[in-house]
Amino acid sequence: MNSRADPGDRYFRVPLENQTQQEFMGSWIPFTPKKPRSSLMVDERVINQDLNGFPGGEFVDRGFCNTGVDHNGVFDHGAHQGVTNLSMMINSLAGSHAQAWSNSERDLLGRSEVTSPLAPVIRNTTGNVEPVNGNFTSDVGMVNGPFTQSGTSQAGYNEFELDDLLNPDQMPFSFTSLLSGGDSLFKVRQYGPPACNKPLYNLNSPIRREAVGSVCESSFQYVPSTPSLFRTGEKTGFLEQIVTTTGHEIPEPKSDKSMQSIMDSSAVNATEATEQNDGSRQDVLEFDLNKTPQQKPSKRKRKFMPKVVVEGKPKRKPRKPAELPKVVVEGKPKRKPRKAATQEKVKSKETGSAKKKNLKESATKKPANVGDMSNKSPEVTLKSCRKALNFDLENPGDARQGDSESEIVQNSSGANSFSEIRDAIGGTNGSFLDSVSQIDKTNGLGAMNQPLEVSMGNQPDKLSTGAKLARDQQPDLLTRNQQCQFPVATQNTQFPMENQQAWLQMKNQLIGFPFGNQQPRMTIRNQQPCLAMGNQQPMYLIGTPRPALVSGNQQLGGPQGNKRPIFLNHQTCLPAGNQLYGSPTDMHQLVMSTGGQQHGLLIKNQQPGSLIRGQQPCVPLIDQQPATPKGFTHLNQMVATSMSSPGLRPHSQSQVPTTYLHVESVSRILNGTTGTCQRSRAPAYDSLQQDIHQGNKYILSHEISNGNGCKKALPQNSSLPTPIMAKLEEARGSKRQYHRAMGQTEKHDLNLAQQIAQSQDVERHNSSTCVEYLDAAKKTKIQKVVQENLHGMPPEVIEIEDDPTDGARKGKNTASISKGASKGNSSPVKKTAEKEKCIVPKTPAKKGRAGRKKSVPPPAHASEIQLWQPTPPKTPLSRSKPKGKGRKSIQDSGKARGPSGELLCQDSIAEIIYRMQNLYLGDKEREQEQNAMVLYKGDGALVPYESKKRKPRPKVDIDDETTRIWNLLMGKGDEKEGDEEKDKKKEKWWEEERRVFRGRADSFIARMHLVQGDRRFSPWKGSVVDSVIGVFLTQNVSDHLSSSAFMSLAARFPPKLSSSREDERNVRSVVVEDPEGCILNLNEIPSWQEKVQHPSDMEVSGVDSGSKEQLRDCSNSGIERFNFLEKSIQNLEEEVLSSQDSFDPAIFQSCGRVGSCSCSKSDAEFPTTRCETKTVSGTSQSVQTGSPNLSDEICLQGNERPHLYEGSGDVQKQETTNVAQKKPDLEKTMNWKDSVCFGQPRNDTNWQTTPSSSYEQCATRQPHVLDIEDFGMQGEGLGYSWMSISPRVDRVKNKNVPRRFFRQGGSVPREFTGQIIPSTPHELPGMGLSGSSSAVQEHQDDTQHNQQDEMNKASHLQKTFLDLLNSSEECLTRQSSTKQNITDGCLPRDRTAEDVVDPLSNNSSLQNILVESNSSNKEQTAVEYKETNATILREMKGTLADGKKPTSQWDSLRKDVEGNEGRQERNKNNMDSIDYEAIRRASISEISEAIKERGMNNMLAVRIKDFLERIVKDHGGIDLEWLRESPPDKAKDYLLSIRGLGLKSVECVRLLTLHNLAFPVDTNVGRIAVRMGWVPLQPLPESLQLHLLELYPVLESIQKFLWPRLCKLDQRTLYELHYQLITFGKVFCTKSRPNCNACPMRGECRHFASAYASARLALPAPEERSLTSATIPVPPESYPPVAIPMIELPLPLEKSLASGAPSNRENCEPIIEEPASPGQECTEITESDIEDAYYNEDPDEIPTIKLNIEQFGMTLREHMERNMELQEGDMSKALVALHPTTTSIPTPKLKNISRLRTEHQVYELPDSHRLLDGMDKREPDDPSPYLLAIWTPGETANSAQPPEQKCGGKASGKMCFDETCSECNSLREANSQTVRGTLLIPCRTAMRGSFPLNGTYFQVNELFADHESSLKPIDVPRDWIWDLPRRTVYFGTSVTSIFRGLSTEQIQFCFWKGFVCVRGFEQKTRAPRPLMARLHFPASKLKNNKT
């Protein structure tokens, strides 16, 4: 067969036919042919070659010491020692190398006494160190020589994989033979490669199937490694490269059955093992590597089990390790955890699971005995495809691993049979190397079946199970994923393993990866290969000196005195040379994360970043190379990657550069990972070696780049203090690292027995610690601490905590180690969090404890070692804490610890590529990936499971100034005085920002009013507790579900109603409606007492400071004088309430604006939402009617101080039954000359008479909040205007007189009584009051009485008021002359505004007015103003800003409020809607059942009950009404303290229930704000466009940006804006598939611009769908618009009909019979007046919406310029087509559009209709009437389709009597005088006017279908309904579904003239019910029926 050498390789490869078995250490290892590897890594090889100086990409430096694990798992010492050029190799062959070989051979031979096959630790023998390290010529092909990856790795050393090392196929000799510990590992032959003096295994032990594949695996349980995608073709020539040639067959050692079990662990191993067991090693050698070997049955793939399970070994500390990704091997069943503490168990493991046994038996026959095997010449056997696939990438050394494992396990002396060793080790599931774990449970080498948690993501999760193997056993070197454990069996060192931290303790050095040329002197003759973590073959191939092995010269702290090779335990990770094996640092220090782990510890399946138990977490191989096909990827790459760039993968917690590994760890790694490191660039390796040697005070002269194969011989006794880890990281498995490790191992020898014993303990410890450490590693990224040791020592490994005893030992060791480390870097190494758990197995307590307590003197070279030896990582697992300064963990950065301290980064391109592929920039560890299943693919590659991609979430671009103001508003920061100029600039900037947002709010409200109707504030009944429960129920679900849940709760726990309430329900109430939706009830208005810092020095024309100073305390007489007015109010209320007919209210509209606040000069700027203000000489003031009790409060605002007038006359009782319904004297109302001005007497007799200039005074338009919208005087005034204040006026118990106290400047409080004008349903007649004028607006819709009567009654009422007011003429006269400026008192109480917004207001020339209440007058009403000053805000917060009070302390707030205000009795308007006491006593399940339909019911039930329990506990009862009187900030803090309420929920309660200034941002608001461009976003990824966003910024961040800009708006504007926004989000701007083409805001919308640009540029123009302007004719039924100058927002028709009285013109004719006037057209609305069009148009006319095409064009152009890369000229082309008729985007066709909604024609029932007898009386403020839906003849309640004809009655002339017969029933009903119908109830009336959050759950035009009449329709005589107007009702499952896909006109029509209905309602139980099928049959049910 052709030689497998690559043409580029300058060294000889062994042809297959010549690849007989090589005799190594007395054992014959058959050459297992390897499937040719893909050339993926060729480039990398080339790079490596270049770096290494070998054009072939692989250097054949065969120095014995330099030998590193070959791809096959053989240590190619030469590869690592010095990758020499061909010339050097040749020279070495011819000269020194050969001599070195012979010397090393002699030394090794001299070691023949070493019997422990598991501990081939090389002792410092007389053998020449150089030869060991020296590069053997390829001719010699010396196994001992650096077993270069002769042909295996095409990629080069950098590509060298752990798998390759472990892959038995590629190993020319079995790992066991390498490990077998004769004094001389190799026998020098005169011909061919040296042969081992002794078999590494017990010849008497039966051969195992895995024997063939156990080459390198024997020490490690093989875990199917994740194949590296890069290394598909690497394996092909590996064996050839490794073994130069050997014409002689090497007798194949017979492997023990125990080894067979080891082979079971991997499919490849099993396959090869079986083949070898068949005696087909020769066949294997004959196999053509270029051909795919014959695949074994797919069953074998099962052997790629990710977990190594040790049965019977319970985890000592069950942990939830971050699970590693599981490798799923097709056809390979998961192995069951095996308990193999005993040999018997091991035996069971030998065969693996029963299935594996069957497979193996069927596949191959076991050789009779080992001897036979050894005698047999290797024959090439065809491997199964599976095997080929496995070794292809995943398990290069699997097949041989089994053999090597078995061989390794066996003592060279035969003292311990391999099977015995395996038994001792404990059966591992064989994930990595069953044999390894089985090698010797006693050795503890068997990794606990737990794979190291650190294992890379590629590693199967089963590694964790692997821990099971070792549980009972002390896993010597167990990487979580690595199941292979390489018990170094050679010598039975008697020192306790526990003390031994590393087998290979380089006395002076930590073993980084001192492979290759490093430490030529460190030939570990007896060294046993360190455990190669990951996919690597065992790092320690016995043939080469292993750093893992303690150098012979080095004395172990324990019985290390025997320089016998120490068996590597996980515990005995490579202890630093300083550390005696007995030293506490021993095993734990050795523990290294595989990624950054010492290579010696790398286990085959272990992913980089994984830790071997004994290893200290360095760079976790796992994290390093999760994606590598073999799970190990290139060991050196992985290690190097992890080592050199541990920081590359932030997620890999245990990524500690290999440099961090302890020397011993390094040595182990060197042994274990030497092969893997071989791939690393030689140059990096060389530099590493150099650093190491320098640290040791001698420099390795060999440079890979130069091709110097030999290093200068170093004194064997001298240890290299190489910063192996750092360098190793750089070298990434470079030879240098290997040599270092080797040199270190030379100095350390361990007794196999002791190591085994310790390993067992360690393994036990590791079983728990591995998982823990891995978890910890994941949780805490291993921090890189670069130790600047003079020697460039690698950073210390993370300290692992052991038992206290362990800690003591470790402390000692670490102390020594730390010394050196500390020299370079005094700063202590960062320790991983205690949570981290080291994989390092605890050293056996029995031996180690004593040792721990004892300080072990460092070896001779300890000082050197200390310099660079890291202390073991500190993990919760290992309790031992390193003592001394050396605590720096190897976690340190991968920087080399060499004197330069630089990290050599000479990586091949392949390595760089690999590292980049594995680069992870996330902040979190990829725990999910580690837990993920990895799919097995036919090519053998293991691909990590890709978790769901997280959808990108954009972030709001918030500037610092916004954050500052937000903090002030939230009370989180104090205002600091700054530069005045800067402050002024900021103030101007904020003014501009707020002006822009006022405009946006006004524009949005106006436009939405045109479409969605009037949604201004209208108070609902309900308590504060109702709203808190309501916000609980509204979280995370749509409003219709939330409202139904509350209704269900109310039905299940109905409130206890008093008889009076029941009586009230049946009393016909007066309907008072006003466009402002304001119904003020003085009884409900609490008094607010607060100090308001107001701008001072606010001079008003005509009011000088002197006049202000004249203010004095007023006497109480002023209040008494107001009594007459109070009486008149009561009389008027009685008269109005006596009316039995509903009527439209007379509205006294304030001059203030309806919409948002604006600047003082912006009155005409945004007229759409504001009423026109009339300024009359004096003051302009407007009064508006209020709630049913008709009491209203007037906000006195402006530059004039109110005066109190007195009068004592009684008001005549006037009959006002129908007065309010009249429309008389509108002109008079409008032309009132005088405004009612209320003054405040300075004292009983004196009145201040200073006249003031005109000012605008705004009447309150909200029940409890006075909106002072503009107190700028004639354009002058505060820098901010339209401040809203919310004085709350409570009627005193004895007197209904609101009292207000003002403190002006520093004067004493002034008292004035805010006058209350009795408001009636009709307009107040003009009242002539000298000196003042007030404009009163009234709008009345159709009434049942003629206008003349109305005018007469209005006149009569006017006289009444005139009389009333004339009685106090004198007072009023004085008042007119004593106008006072109360502007200062009108500041908003909330810091909504100026203060926070304008921090400089404190310095302004405004005078501070403090509003205080007299504590003695608790019963009297007071006005509290919302402060805007930052100072006041801070005062209000008090200590609340510091933090939330304990719940028990909140009652003090209630007491303060009630103490100041007095406990207010609850009235009918704030009563609870639910019996909360019953809920509190109910069980959680009962509450949960009531709200089950909503979802999340269990959690909410708990929260609701906890909330009720809390308020009862804190306050003694369920009552939070006191929050209405509490300061807004304190109320906010209190609500936030409730569990389950967030900022959005609290803001909802405050705005909608407490009527504070707040603006909640829910999902609808946030989404709209982003799409409209109101909130700036940080740049989005190029691939993501705005219209493709699925996630939006966090709501709180949106609120953080919006609130500082909206905080100056008044409460009414905020309410309407919020209500319109949430409705807009449900109707148009839905989360998915928004109705952009019908959206009236699309002209300004960024979302639409993005979608439009994308669609227009990528798709053909859609069909022209013009958004026709609304041309719906106005029905003749409606009255023409009434020209009321002050009325801006006439009510739509449905409101006019709310009274139940049809219009005069149409009350006699059905609407259907009147033809529409086609000729009538809406008045064309120009662009300028679009926003206020509806103010002056017919209230019944639907306004026209016109798209602002210019604005759209600008928005589109801006979007395209910013976000799209267009060619020159594309922009103009793209915008050419912009036209209103084409401004649409393609939309997906809606499915089941016919099922989204169902339209029904219904009749409108007046309130007095006979059908409503017995029904609840309609609520006064309910805009919707009762409706009647008529059934189609033959229709049933559940009929979803029109009834079908069921008889032929028509033909016969006779009708059937079948109720379901459509035809007959239609004829019958047509002839009958009755029809069937279902009642529809207005939602507000159905809920009796009480609902949480002010009823915003519902639409203003929402109805409920009466459930009873839905099931059994009522019979209605036709003559009852024939003349009623008709309406359209849309039925559906939700508001969103009803409006989906409708055009703008259709949506407009629904809101203006139609109604929506989404649920039924059962009146008796008051519970919600689903709609019956006849009303609406949803598509979801239709689908179910079909199925």
UniProtKB/Swiss-Prot annotation:
UniProt key word 4Fe-4S: yes
Described purpose of this protein according to its UniProt entry: Transcriptional activator involved in gene imprinting. Catalyzes the release of 5-methylcytosine (5-meC) from DNA by a glycosylase/lyase mechanism. Allows the expression of the maternal copy of the imprinted MEA gene before fertilization, possibly by antagonizing or suppressing DNA methylation on target promoter. Probably acts by nicking the MEA promoter. Required for stable reproducible patterns of floral and vegetative development.
Keywords: 4Fe-4S, Activator, DNA-binding, Hydrolase, Iron, Iron-sulfur, Metal-binding, Nucleus, Transcription, Transcription regulation
Highest classification ranks of the organism: Eukaryota, Viridiplantae, Streptophyta, Embryophyta, Tracheophyta
Compositional bias ranges of the Polar residues kind: 258-277, 813-829
InterPro entries: DME/ROS1, DNA_glycosylase, Endonuclease3_FeS-loop_motif, HhH-GPD_domain, HhH_base_excis_C, Perm-CXXC, RRM_DME
Note: Although strongly related to DNA glycosylase proteins, it differs from these proteins because of its large size and its unique N-terminal basic domain. The DNA repair function has not been proved and may not exist.
Cellular compartment(s): Nucleus
MF annotations from Gene Ontology: 4 iron, 4 sulfur cluster binding; DNA binding; DNA demethylase activity; DNA N-glycosylase activity; DNA-(apurinic or apyrimidinic site) endonuclease activity; metal ion binding; SUMO binding
Compositional bias of kind Basic residues: 844-855
Cofactor or coenzyme needed: [4Fe-4S] cluster
UniProt xrefs under SUPFAM superfamilies: DNA-glycosylase
Family named by the database record: Belongs to the DNA glycosylase family. DEMETER subfamily.
Full protein name: Transcriptional activator DEMETER
